[in-house]
Design a protein with these regions (language model features):
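C-terminal motif of bacterial Sec signal peptides marking the signal peptidase cleavage site
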Residues: 17-20
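Bacterial signal peptide processing site
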Residues: 22-25
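Beta-alpha junction/loop-to-helix N-cap segments that form part of ligand/metal-binding clefts
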Residues: 28-29, 33-34, 61-63, 73-148, ...
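Extracytoplasmic "Venus flytrap"
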Residues: 36-68, 86-95, 117-119, 184-192, ...
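Periplasmic-binding protein-like
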Residues: 48, 104-117, 137-139, 180-185, ...
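Extracellular/periplasmic Venus flytrap/periplasmic-binding protein
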Residues: 99, 144-145, 152-254, 289-297
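Extracellular/periplasmic periplasmic-binding protein-like sensory domains
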Residues: 247-318, 376-380
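Segments of small-molecule ligand-sensing domains
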Residues: 306-314, 325-376
Length: 384
């Protein structure tokens, strides 16, 4: 299938040529310019909330790099009124999320959050952001239930697993032609949620299921179940560290079963964990745009800044940060004003035109299939 992408996106540089910094009416506070209601839009912070260390650190670093690129571009255009990126390293751990969220809330100069990156930590942190009126735009948390909590500060720039799950099932059925599928999840908010949707979408084609745990090392019981099930393909809902070990152990056991995984596995760390030979042929679904198809000069700008190609969710991280930067550029200097601005946002980003519904979901959604080929993760096709 020939990939179809519809983008009407201006140059990244033009998108970041925001309104110059200036004062607005209102009272000052003793602490200086803050997001709580100051007279100026200078000295504000945008927080990144996600894993920068731990087993899923690569995905968080990808997002932070995208957000930083957007902020650096803004600061170049507004040198006398810069915005700071503040990082909150959750390690992807829901248990750490509440304290970190409260830390961000308590810093009144924080005007918005890019993240949380993962669904489990989002479930733990977003109620705190909502209570404080602090906007949180996730570039990567895909559990559908996150949008069903009435959080007026919750937004995401990509489709959720209610679109990714059926798309993965469609690929398994229509492209791989699998009639027998085993579904495995890692018991996480994200992994189990996505796997359950895939399972429901596949219906009678599911011949067996299994649940593993994050940080698990020995997957031999699951490999045995895969063999005995007669599955032609396996869908795994979880992250790249466990997926890589699972695929390695499948290969070591002589299984040729095709492994299909979700966006949490779309990282080179998967190939490292599985080994190049074992990883070959893996199918990865993601509600994310291939980085080289991002609009404007994003791809070239990212490579210049980091001497590397954009990775999973780097472009989405850029877009999430840019929405908040546009609010600042428009003179929105209170948290309440930023939330209102984001709720009515309707502008081109580098991944799509960004517009949100009443629940914070994006108006444009696409899901892509990627494959591991020659030791690299490459686009296969948009699943339509």
């Amino acid at each position: 299938m020939r990939p179809i992408i519809k983008l009407g996106v201006p140059l990244v540089a033009a998108a970041l040529a925001l309104t110059a910094c200036g004062g607005t009416s209102g009272g000052n506070t003793a602490g200086g310019n803050t997001a709580g209601g100051d007279s100026k839009k200078c000295d504000l912070k945008i927080g990144f909330f996600g894993a920068l260390t731990g087993d899923a650190a690569n995905l968080g670093q990808n997002i932070q790099n995208g957000a930083k690129l957007a902020i650096d571009g803004y600061n170049t255009a507004n040198a006398d009124c810069k915005v700071t990126l503040e990082s909150y390293d959750s390690q992807g751990d829901p248990a750490q999320a509440p304290a970190l969220a409260q830390k961000a809330v308590d810093d009144k100069s924080v005007i918005g959050i890019v993240g949380p990156a993962f669904s489990g930590e989002s479930k733990a942190a977003d109620p705190i952001f909502s209570a404080a009126g602090l906007v949180a735009i996730t570039p990567s948390a895909t559990n559908p239930a996150l949008a069903e909590n009435g959080w007026k500060t919750f937004f995401r720039v990509l489709g959720n697993d209610a679109s990714q799950g059926p798309a993965a099932a469609k690929y398994i059925s229509d492209v791989l032609k699998s009639q027998k599928v085993m579904v495995v999840d890692d018991a996480s908010e994200y992994g189990k949620g996505l796997a359950d949707i895939v399972k429901s979408s596949l219906g009678a084609k599911v011949v067996d299921t299994d649940t593993v745990q994050q940080k698990q090392i020995d997957f031999s019981p699951t490999v045995t179940k895969i063999r005995s099930s007669g599955a032609e393909s396996v869908f795994f809902g979880g992250y790249y560290a466990e997926a890589g070990l699972l695929k390695k152990q499948m290969a070591d056991a002589g299984l040729k079963t095709i492994l299909v995984v979700g966006d949490g596995v779309k990282d080179d760390g998967y190939i490292t964990a599985a080994g190049k030979a074992a990883a070959e042929g893996t199918i990865i679904t993601c509600p994310c745009l291939p980085p080289d198809k991002a609009g404007g000069t994003f791809y070239a700008d990212f490579k210049k800044a980091y001497n590397a190609e954009p990775a999973t969710y780097s472009a989405e991280g850029f877009d999430a940060a840019k929405v908040i930067l546009d609010a600042i550029g428009a003179g929105k200097v209170t948290r309440a004003d930023v939330v209102a601005y984001v709720a009515s946002y309707d502008k081109p980003g580098v991944t799509k035109t960004l517009k949100f519904d009443a629940k914070g979901e994006p108006s444009e959604i696409s899901v892509w299939a990627y494959k591991v080929e020659g030791g690299k993760i490459v686009p296969d096709q948009e699943i339509k």
